[in-house]
């Protein structure tokens, strides 16, 4: 899917290739083989949908892993400086195939922004007019779902755990912001 995403905006940039290598943590002795697979995938006429369905089946019910895959795809799309509309559409379609709701997708997308640009309510899957109690419940739910220790206990790949740590930072930052906003 990373090959298809890299190609969807018309060209595969050097930055996107570096991002794929960085996020997938490819061992040095396998880079050539993975490169061949990547090149073949980006040139194939087959769309990304079969790959997305395959991943959705493999990780059926493991929302944490599926959300982290979306995070990794955003990381790759962002690596060349901007996320094109075609890249965004593709990532959104993959999220739908994974069974993620629009609220979950928007939360992931929002958490990709730098902390000073985050909308804390979107990150916490809530609205500004929700009570602090409702937002706190969502915060606790998201914290539990994305906690790196939980993912480690499930044996997920390290890159998924790393993305989970970044997501937790966004969740915690959003909660801090909401507490400040609601106390005023």
Go through each PLM region and give its residues.
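Small-residue-enriched hydrophobic alpha-helices in membranes
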Residues: 1-7, 11-184
């Amino acid at each position: 899917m990373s090959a298809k995403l890299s190609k969807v905006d018309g060209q595969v940039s050097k930055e996107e290739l570096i991002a794929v290598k960085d996020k997938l943590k490819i061992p040095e002795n396998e880079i050539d083989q993975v490169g061949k697979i990547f090149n073949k995938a980006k040139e194939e006429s087959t769309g990304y949908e079969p790959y997305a369905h395959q991943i959705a089946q493999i990780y059926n019910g493991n929302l944490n892993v599926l959300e982290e895959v979306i995070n990794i795809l955003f990381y790759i799309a962002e690596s060349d400086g901007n996320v094109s509309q075609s890249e965004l559409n593709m990532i959104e379609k993959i999220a739908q195939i994974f069974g993620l709701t629009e609220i979950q997708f928007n939360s992931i997308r929002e958490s990709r922004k730098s902390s000073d640009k985050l909308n804390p309510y979107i990150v916490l899957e809530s609205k500004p007019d929700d009570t602090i109690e409702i937002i706190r419940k969502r915060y606790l739910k998201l914290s539990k779902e994305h906690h790196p220790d939980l993912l480690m206990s499930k044996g997920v790949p390290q890159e998924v755990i790393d993305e989970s740590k970044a997501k937790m930072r966004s969740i915690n930052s959003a909660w801090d912001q909401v507490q400040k906003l609601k106390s005023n």
